[in-house]
Amino acid sequence: MKITGIYKILNIITNKSYIGQSLDVKDRIRRHKYNLNRGKHSNPHLQKSYIKYGTDNFKYEILYQFDVNGLSKDDICNHLNIKEIEMIILFDSFNNGYNLTTGGDRHYIVSDATKIKLSESHKG
């Protein structure tokens, strides 16, 4: 079963994090591990740290997941963008971590209508 959401890669020695988003978090984490182990990760700061501290000093965690049933792909991506930005701020992973951007890079603009839908979907 696919999990859509936000994940964190944490260096347990330095407490630095990388925050990411995915429509399939488990597969995305698997691909991060594969590329890091091969020394071919697209994020040079994360790769360098991984080589220095070793695989045993990195923890992978799903921070946030949500039910995508009934949502359009645009709504899903907008929601992921918003949550990714929130988590990057929360864990300070742009200024003091491995994120190379401030997040929300799925190239979708969060419309007011989408913001209302997302807000309503999270009310009890």
Regions found by a protein language model. Give the residues of each.
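Structure-specific nucleic-acid interaction/processing domains
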Residues: M1-K117
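Short, intrinsically disordered, charge-balanced linker/junction segments flanking boundaries
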Residues: S119-G124
